[in-house]
Amino acid sequence: MRVDLQGGSVEFKARESVVSKIEASLQPGFEPVQPKYAATVMLVRDSAPFQTEYRIESDHFPPDFPTGQELEVFMLRRVKTMEFVPDAVVFPGGRVDDRDSNPNLPWCGPAPAEWAELMGCTEDVARRVVVAAAREVFEECGVLLAGPDEHSVVQDLSDPSWQEDRTALENHEIAFADMLILRGLVLRTDLLGLISNFCTPEFETKRYDTFFFSALMPEGQVADGETSEAQIADWVTPAYAMRAGDAGNWLLLAPTVYNLTCIASAQNAKEFVETRRRLTRFMSYPIKKEDGTFMLHCDFPKRK
């Protein structure tokens, strides 16, 4: 992995599993698959000494990598059996569900029209993506961005019924909106920041148009990795994640690297989460070297 912070790009050697896809995409008549919408949430907190086993005090990668106040972000390692990017270390997230569009869901924060303007999409798409972001972070790490009113969030999720709801959501047995309505809760979209928009490369057979959100870890709640999609989960600093990726210990994707640089550039978690920028979609593309090796290059979007 080669990161150019000054030029704003990252370049990886293409994994063997995708080389055949790249070669197929270069053939005449190739038509890329239409991407599906997805949402990802970077759950962050301000770190403190000895808060996690992954804490590192110095020796960061790369030398000029910004560290701010050493924010921590919650990351998951996907199980090896996943069809899409198995074993990758990612932020909680997933595909938008058709049932994420319920207009009756009590909603607090920017209206769908405001999100749509920033995201460059329709109001319906914006609504579904924002709801999917909140649903996925609850499904995958047990963090609920909702409360009884616009000024609070649920703090105690220890009752077994919450885990039952998570399982039902993961199995598509209940809609997230229905769960919140039944519990008399309001979706707190004001707790979400909007950071970036990445589209899966055109050579992939599964493609996602993914919006990356941020959220401050709610007080009183505990993030976990109790999902069938993750091998392990924990809080890490961006510098640690970058170092693990460079060493080859972690599989990091281009959007993950870009978003880690965004987190590290923030002075604190609150500042990072308050960011809502108008987005420019970015994507990786293959480059064939003289020796026949394929590299995946990604130019980072300019931050507005």
Which ranges hold each PLM region?
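N-terminal leader/linker segments that precede catalytic domains of diphosphate-processing enzymes
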Residues: M1-K304
